[in-house]
């Protein structure tokens, strides 16, 4: 991965450090020195894959690494690392396929049975509007 990232322009890639920086323990350390700002509504959204094959490259490769350190994950971030704020939403995959990190950010522009990413973000924005944001 480092060689591929270097060809893409990263002068000093460190793939493993990037992945381990998202472990639950690394997030806990970072959160301890990053307090919430007063008056800001914090919420988090997370999904997970059922198997490594449910994420496209490179998430299919990072899934087992994250699983080894922290368990249930979306191919990049562990569920326990993502919990933050007043509201936490866990997107539960329907059926055998999971919902990868790439799926949640609509990286692959895929239609996933039981999960419409565009409608999810519309409902998220509508909820923020209802809350007065």
What are these regions (language model features)?
Residues 1-133:
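Helical cap/lid subdomain of alpha/beta-hydrolase-fold lipid enzymes
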């Amino acid at each position: 991965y480092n060689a591929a990232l270097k060809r893409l322009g990263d002068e000093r890639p460190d793939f493993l450090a990037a992945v381990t920086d998202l472990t639950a323990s690394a997030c806990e350390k970072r959160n301890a020195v990053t307090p919430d700002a007063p008056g800001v509504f914090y919420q988090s959204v997370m999904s997970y894959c059922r198997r490594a094959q449910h994420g496209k490259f490179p998430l299919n490769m990072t899934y087992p690494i994250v699983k080894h350190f922290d368990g249930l994950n979306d191919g990049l971030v562990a569920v326990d690392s993502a919990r933050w704020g007043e509201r936490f939403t866990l997107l539960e995959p329907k059926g055998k396929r999971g919902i990868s990190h790439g799926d949640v950010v609509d990286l692959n522009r895929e239609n996933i049975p039981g999960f419409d990413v565009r409608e999810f973000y519309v409902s998220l924005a509508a909820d923020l509007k209802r809350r007065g944001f």
